[in-house]
């Protein structure tokens, strides 16, 4: 069952779901709560490797990722981040989210931004039960023009679903969870896959 606006507000008030800083109640819609863009970004360095062998030996994959990903880019609140057509970038939400082990979250981009070509989450829009941290966004500009994105702008909407039971393996208790408590635009850790 997906939570409605009054349940989202109640779950926030009771601390069942935590979002920090907490968005005002005006950011809670019928079945979602708006999240804003943070100021942490990462991009791919152009032509720094001919390819990434995602199924290769861990050490080689790790070295390739180090070569192709930029260091963290922090921008000021009044500074735009330009996402050019055909470019993938990582960013974070401003808010940090904590979910209990019986609730799953779903992050969707805004229709108004999608109509300009912005994909907010290329594939991974599921926020696992037991998640805690900022949500990393996988931005892609499929439009024809560069997009100027600024910290604090509304970037997506988070909805919540109650699971049939408490998860036996919530994200915060998994040993193989690669992105626990992330607070910045963490690059891919595919090299840590089992």
UniProtKB/Swiss-Prot annotation:
Gene3D superfamilies: 2.70.40.10
Keywords linked to the UniProt accession: Hydrolase, Nucleotide metabolism, Nucleotide-binding
Positions of transmembrane segments: none
Pathway: Pyrimidine metabolism; dUMP biosynthesis; dUMP from dCTP (dUTP route): step 1/2
Chemical reaction(s) catalysed: dCTP + H2O + H(+) = dUTP + NH4(+)
GO MF entry, a single one: dCTP deaminase activity
Enzyme Commission number(s): 3.5.4.13
Tagged with keyword RNA-binding: no
SUPFAM superfamilies: dUTPase-like
Enzyme class: hydrolase
Top-rank lineage group of the source organism: Bacteria
Keyword Protease appears in the UniProt entry: no
Any Pfam family hit: DCD
Active-site residues, Swiss-Prot/TrEMBL: 138
Record-level GO BP terms: dUMP biosynthetic process; dUTP biosynthetic process; nucleobase-containing small molecule interconversion
InterPro entries: dCTP_deaminase (IPR011962), dUTPase-like_sf (IPR036157), dUTPase_trimeric (IPR033704)
Positions of dCTP binding: 110-115, 128, 136-138, 171, 178, 182
Function statement: Catalyzes the deamination of dCTP to dUTP.
HAMAP family: dCTP_deaminase (MF_00146)
Subunit structure, as described in the record: Homotrimer.
Similarity section: Belongs to the dCTP deaminase family.
Designated name of the protein: dCTP deaminase
């Amino acid at each position: 069952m997906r939570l409605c606006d009054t349940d989202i507000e109640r779950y926030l008030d009771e601390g069942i779901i935590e979002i920090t800083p907490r968005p005002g109640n005006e950011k809670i819609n019928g079945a979602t709560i708006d999240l804003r863009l943070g100021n942490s970004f990462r991009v791919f360095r152009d032509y720094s490797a001919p390819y990434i062998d995602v199924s290769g030996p861990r050490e080689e994959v790790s070295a390739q990722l180090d070569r192709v990903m930029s260091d963290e880019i922090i921008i000021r609140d009044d500074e735009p981040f330009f996402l050019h057509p055909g470019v993938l970038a990582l960013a974070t939400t401003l808010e940090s989210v904590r979910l209990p082990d019986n609730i799953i979250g779903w992050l969707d981009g805004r229709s108004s931004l999608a109509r300009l070509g912005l994909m907010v989450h290329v594939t991974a829009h599921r926020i696992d039960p037991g998640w805690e941290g900022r949500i990393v966004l996988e931005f892609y500009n499929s439009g024809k023009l560069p997009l100027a994105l600024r910290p604090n702008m509304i970037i997506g909407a988070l909805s919540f679903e109650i699971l049939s039971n408490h998860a036996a393996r919530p994200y915060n208790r998994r040993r193989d969870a690669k992105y626990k408590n992330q607070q910045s635009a963490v690059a891919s850790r595919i090299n840590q896959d089992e």
